[in-house]
């Protein structure tokens, strides 16, 4: 589990300066001053960004907001070119968007090991060996290296989770993700226990790992910024499957179901076009008659499963349903 989830950060980046070319003349026996042989400066290091499917947050960059690449080295005698500066690579989760401070999208990282150059390093300056000509046999000048580029980037993460768990506060989302993945979120009996998106990975039989995101509880008006607001709803946009969760403890199932549907519809209508499943949690509190009453209240077109993290009812059915769709 990621205790300190971060999905938005600003970082200052500077690529490396190019090394300078040098002024140097060949020295040989019996020759006081030979021809120019000053080498070129090395190229400054680039700033790159790389996708890493083992990362699920950009929290590791929270206290490293200055990324500076190495400068190129100056040239040497005998026309030796200075070594290039080392690149600085920013590792980010899949689904990271890179913007400028005006919110314009620059690039998006969508694949593991996908690598993009954010800033090129400065070019190395030329040594004096380049400036010899018929009019000037002994040039006493060389070029300085080009300065590196500076820029402030905004990194925003939209999680590329396979499954998004959505529900009202205290509906049992965190308990569910702790039961079917290795995630251990904070769980308590009060609303908004989940203050950040929790990420868990489900490993089941021969299926590839399945990433599940527990989105903080949605309340009426969430799409307009109420409660924890829409800042977390953006993570749902990239989920392949949406799992709606209603607690068996609520009384008006249809009402709370409609709150979730309406908020998602206001935020992004395309979310409701995704594969989805309705889960009634804490079903150990229900007898068969109450389950039947709930089913009558809910829309007939919804696929639903009753689950209990206490009795384990429905958990394997839920896992199988998710795996079957993703396969």
Swiss-Prot record:
The keyword Magnesium applies. It is found in: Cytoplasm. It holds the Pfam family MMR_HSR1. Residues 161-327 form the OBG-type G domain. InterPro entries: G_OBG, GTP-bd, GTP-bd_Obg/CgtA, GTP1-OBG_CS, GTP1_OBG_dom, GTP1_OBG_dom_sf, OBG_GTPase, P-loop_NTPase. GO terms for biological process: ribosome biogenesis. GO terms for molecular function: GTP binding; GTPase activity; magnesium ion binding. Residues 3-160 form the Obg domain. PROSITE patterns: G_OBG (PS51710), GTP1_OBG (PS00905), OBG (PS51883). GTP binds at residues 167-174, 192-196, 214-217, 281-284, 308-310. Its main location: cytoplasm. NCBIfam families: Obg_CgtA, PRK12299.1, small_GTP. Monomer. This is GTPase Obg. The gene is obg.
């Amino acid at each position: 589990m990621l205790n300190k989830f971060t999905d938005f950060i600003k970082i200052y980046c500077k690529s490396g300066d190019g090394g300078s070319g040098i002024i140097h003349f060949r020295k040989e026996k019996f020759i006081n001053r030979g021809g120019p042989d000053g080498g070129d400066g090395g190229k400054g290091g680039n700033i790159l960004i790389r996708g890493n499917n083992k990362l699920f947050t950009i929290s590791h960059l929270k206290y490293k907001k200055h990324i500076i690449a190495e400068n190129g080295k100056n040239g040497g005698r005998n026309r030796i070119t200075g070594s290039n500066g080392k690149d600085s690579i920013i590792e980010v989760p899949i689904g990271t968007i890179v913007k400028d401070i005006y919110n314009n999208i620059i690039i998006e990282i969508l694949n593991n090991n996908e690598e993009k150059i954010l800033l090129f390093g400065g070019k190395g300056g030329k040594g004096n060996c380049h400036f010899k000509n018929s009019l000037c046999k002994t040039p006493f000048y060389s070029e300085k290296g080009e300065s590196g580029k500076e820029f402030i980037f905004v990194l925003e993460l939209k999680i590329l989770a396979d499954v998004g768990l959505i529900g009202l506060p205290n509906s049992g989302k965190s308990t569910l993700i702790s039961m079917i993945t290795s995630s251990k979120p904070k769980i308590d009996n009060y609303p908004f226990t989940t203050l950040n998106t929790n990420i868990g990975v489900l490993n089941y039989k021969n299926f590839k790992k399945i990433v599940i995101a527990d989105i903080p509880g949605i309340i009426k008006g969430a799409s307009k910024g109420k409660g924890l607001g829409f800042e977390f709803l953006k993570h749902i946009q990239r989920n392949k499957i949406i799992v709606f969760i209603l607690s068996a403890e609520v009384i008006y199932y249809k009402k709370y179901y409609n709150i979730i549907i309406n908020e998602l519809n206001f935020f992004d209508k395309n979310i409701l076009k995704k594969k989805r499943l309705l889960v009634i949690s804490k079903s150990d509190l229900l007898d068969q008659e109450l389950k039947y009453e709930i089913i009558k209240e809910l829309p007939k077109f919804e696929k639903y499963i009753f689950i209990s993290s206490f009795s384990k009812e429905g958990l394997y059915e839920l896992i199988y349903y998710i795996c079957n769709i993703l396969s």
